[in-house]
Each structure stands twice: as structure tokens, then as C-alpha cells.
Curated annotation (Swiss-Prot):
Primary gene name: eutC
Pathway connected to this protein: Amine and polyamine degradation; ethanolamine degradation
Subcellular location: Bacterial microcompartment
NCBIfam families in alphabetical order: PRK05465.1 (NF003971)
Protein name: Ethanolamine ammonia-lyase small subunit
Alphabetized UniProt keyword annotations: Bacterial microcompartment, Cobalamin, Cobalt, Lyase
Taxonomic placement: Bacteria, Pseudomonadati, Pseudomonadota, Gammaproteobacteria, Enterobacterales
Amino acid sequence: MDQKQIEEIVRSVMASMGQDVPQPVAPSTQAGAKPQCAAPTVTESCALDLGSAEAKAWIGVENPHRADVLTELRRSTAARVCTGRAGPRPRTQALLRFLADHSRSKDTVLKEVPEEWVKAQGLLEVRSEISDKNLYLTRPDMGRRLSPEAIDALKSQCVMNPDVQVVVSDGLSTDAITANYEEILPPLLAGLKQAGLNVGTPFFVRYGRVKIEDQIGEILGAKVVILLVGERPGLGQSESLSCYAVYSPRVATTVEADRTCISNIHQGGTPPVEAAAVIVDLAKRMLEQKASGINMTR
């Protein structure tokens, strides 16, 4: 699927929902326009917030021959470029930012989604067989199965045999859920209903792994299961969400190749609203083709 197809899908789904189509961000230098002046090299400072946009745009190369080239390179990527060196070593600010980003990524793995937040969203909360974060990190197999209490809750409180079942799980990034939830779930549910699909009761799974959607789909009899789960964070990016969609999942027979994945959902990657529109179109195609993953015709 190329960019034009994605834009057409987003435009169609958003129009059917009666919402404005998000406009693409204008490039920094348009044809015929004068390029912006290069930003000066920022002096190292202990007072600088290492998580700020200013710190991310910092250029540590002293006395560059072409400062404008470095500025344009820095704008074009989130990679750690143009940080300069102090002899054979990284400069102090570059090292401190690396450590700060690593700490932020570690924090989002270890943090918990607050129970108050889940209640505020009006979501039913269930758990996998995991009881705490440490066990979640060391026993991924237990995160693939629902607890007995969760199974009973789903059978008693959720819509059975839906066309599409949407599930939210913390995964390996708490920030991915709390930061993107309001911009992806409401338009996703609205788009699915607008498409005339029977949507199940959305709920939150604490300590869930991707394969837990197979058991959920089997219990509820869902034709398509959509799991929104926090991705393993990278350095400096702790808010990335993934969508794993699967058709008619079964615990015993569904394999990873049966899933269709849309990753890198966040404001710096695929915008959540745009991702919601693409997921709606994906669910419709899965129901039409009665397949998912590598079994779908392109």
C-alpha cells in the first residue's frame, strides 16, 4: 500500500464520519522559496531540558564548514547525528541526552497504566495470568493467556459474536496507550460502526502479549480481533503504538504470519487518527476476503 492509497483511505473514512481530513505538514523548504537560515550551534548547558525539542535539535559540531547542511540533516531524522566529539569521546550533552532517553524508555516499560485512567475511559479491565510487572517481563508465555477471572468477565460483560472486537493492552509501553488513546480509539470505533459493522465491547487487558488476542477471539466468537498494544520503546521514543489485526483467531492454529501489523503509531510517526482510518479499511477487507496476514490478496 503506497502513500496515495493511504491518503485516499483516510480521506474516504474521515469523510464518512463527518470529520475534517488532517492536512499534511508543509515541507520546510518549498519550491521557489528561500531556504531557512541554519540554526546556530547550541552551547552545552546543564540547564537545558534533555527531553525538550531544543535538546533534540542541538548541533554539537563546533565551527562547521557548512552549518546549513548540518541543520537540514538534523531536521530530516530523529537519529543521533551532528552531535560532535570531544577528542575520541562524545560531548557531554550528547552523552547525557543518550542516558536520559534510555532512562525514559526504561521508565515506560516499568510503569503501570493507572487503574483510575482505565475507569475514566469507561473500559472494562481484565488481566492475563500475570500478577505483576516483573513476572510480565520474565514470563511472556503467561501474558498470552487470560486469567480465569478475565474469561468469566468477558463471557458475562461483552458482546458475543461481533464482526470486530477491539482490545487495548499496555504491552511494553504505558505511554503509548495513555498518549494515543483519545486520538485513535474514538475515531476507530466510530469508523467501524459507520461501515455498518457489529463492534464488540472494547476493553483493556493488563499485562497482555500479542497472542492473547487469539484466546479473546475464540472466547467471544469474533470474526476480526484488533489489538492496540504498546510497542517496545526505543531510545527517545516511548509513545509508539502497534495494531495487530487477525481474522477468526484460534489458540491452537493461528500463527504470527496470520496477523497484519500496523506499527509506529504516534504523533512523530503514523498519526493516530490516520491509523484509525487505515485500520477501519483493513477490517473491512479482512471480512470481505475472510483472511488476514499473508493470506490476504494484495
